[in-house]
């Protein structure tokens, strides 16, 4: 399904194009990346959690600075549709807390 929109990895031209902007394949060794909080869910059927784990691990391994690279795994959750309001509020609170902490914003 994705090949129609993005191209097929079996076509060399498509493959080279995909790799050129792949978030995973464009992580540079030793670059000073900003603080990152990657969100995934254990039952996501659109973005397989393994992709988020691999991206986070690669970013951690190649990080040249000291900023944290973290992954947050939502339990019993999917891609977002039908998520309870309580869970949405908690996720937003976590994201804002991480962002404010990393920016040094006091309260």
Task: Please give the residue ranges for each predicted region.
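Active-site-proximal cap/loop segments of hydrolase catalytic domains
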Residues: 1-107
């Amino acid at each position: 399904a994705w090949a129609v929109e993005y191209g097929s990895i079996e076509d060399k031209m498509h493959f080279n194009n995909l790799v050129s902007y792949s978030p995973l394949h464009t992580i540079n060794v030793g670059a000073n990346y900003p603080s990152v909080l990657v969100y995934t869910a254990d039952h996501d059927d659109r973005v397989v959690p393994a992709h988020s784990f691999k991206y986070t691990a690669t970013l951690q391994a190649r990080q040249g600075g000291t900023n944290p690279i973290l992954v947050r795994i939502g339990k019993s959750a999917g891609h977002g549709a039908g998520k309870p309001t309580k869970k949405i509020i908690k996720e937003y609170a976590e994201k804002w807390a991480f962002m404010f902490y990393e920016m040094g914003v006091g309260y």
